[in-house]
Amino acid sequence: MVRKLSKTRYGARAFDDRAGCYCVFEALRRLSRESAKLDYKVVSVATTQEEIGTRGALTAAYALDPQVGLAVDVDHATDFPTCDKRKFGSIKLGSGVVISRGPNINPKVFDRLVESAERENIPYQIGAESRPTGTDARVIQMARGGVATGLLGIPLRYMHTPSEVADLADIEGCVKLIASFAASLKNSDDFTF
């Protein structure tokens, strides 16, 4: 059951990771209007077992052998009183999609995501990952000879509970950013560093 909590906030179980699936598929729907203009093929995968070893992403990335991969997941919103922002960072519900930076993230993909967000006036937050993430990005970037990988997160309160809370503005921003990022890619892009 989905409950409306305010104008743009909703509570439900399993936003992790239904929200990410929605964002990817909606971005693909919007991109399909521009498919004649795209310089490459866009492929989407809804993976399984991300929470228990990222097995679905591992096999999918190996089979597809992409040049660029973008994992879309949720990120812990830390905007509640008992959360230590110094330890967990400051991610706010309703303040935009989270663009992660860290050891699994290709810096050129990160920069392109930020450029896309700024070009389209899409609100975003930066998530700092000090070690490999527990997301599909962790294994996508290691597939075959390596994949230039980015990670987007939808801020989510009360993750892994029956009462997760998400903001529709963050979800819409994620959709727009995926579509804008994908539309900006060219076959000639070099993501090596």
Identify the residue ranges that each predicted region occupies.
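A glycine-rich helix N-cap at a beta->alpha junction
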Residues: 60-79
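Glycine-rich phosphate- or other oxyanion-binding loops that anchor nucleotides, phosphorylated ligands
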Residues: 1-3, 12, 49-56, 117-120
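Alpha-helical metal-binding/catalytic segments enriched in His/Glu/Asp
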Residues: 7-51, 177-181
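Acidic-glycine-rich active-site phosphate/pyrophosphate-binding loop
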Residues: 1-4, 84-85, 148-153
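Short glycine/serine/threonine-rich phosphate/pyrophosphate-binding segments
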Residues: 18-21, 52-56, 134-137, 161
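Acidic, glycine-rich active-site loops and adjacent beta-strand->loop/helix elements
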Residues: 2, 42-52, 74-76, 131, ...
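Active-site-adjacent substrate-binding region
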Residues: 91-175, 180-193
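Active-site loop ensemble at the mouth of alpha/beta enzyme cores that anchors a bound cofactor
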Residues: 66, 83-96
